[in-house]
Amino acid sequence: AATELFRITKKTKYLKAARKRAHNLNSRLTAQGWFVSDNAERPFYHGVEAGLPIIALVDYLAIERNRNIKEKTKRTIKVSLDNQIALNTQVTNPFNLARQTFVSEKDGQASKIQESFFTPHDENVMWQGENARLASLTAAAIYGGKISHKDPQGAFGINPELASFAQSQIDWLMGKNPYQISMLYGFGVNNPPHARSAGTMS
């Protein structure tokens, strides 16, 4: 919000606010390449907006003119995206599906840091599918990659490895998955059946 407010008003107070938030995000990146969440031990993961930290930093870079701050922010983007690619290649992953670092909780006790596919839901009331998370990571890979992994000749203008990652998430959504189901309602084949409780989708 601070980035957009500065973009519209050009008021210095919003640039300062955007810088503060960018500094906070840059400071939350660990040496391993994941972002610290609400305490010093829990990695950031999200059922919908897994790519938001990178997307927000890319947007912020468009208004920042301080060279040192820009370089630090670009480094954050690069390290985070490099970590995502490394995470994906640590295990057999025929669909190149995005993996993540997370901590689960049971009976008030946090687990050790884990790496896996899909968002863990534990036993709480949260329910969230993976589709938005994968789309968010695709956006982060493409927008962030144009800054940190640029390749003018590559797909999406980014290097082949990151482009393959981005495309693989969309491929999964469109039906290149073990279920051969297109997750985008009305497109592809074998769409999940329409649930009356979902209301009108057409």
Task: Label each residue range with its predicted role.
Residues 1-202:
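Glycan-recognition and catalytic cores of secretory/periplasmic carbohydrate-active enzymes
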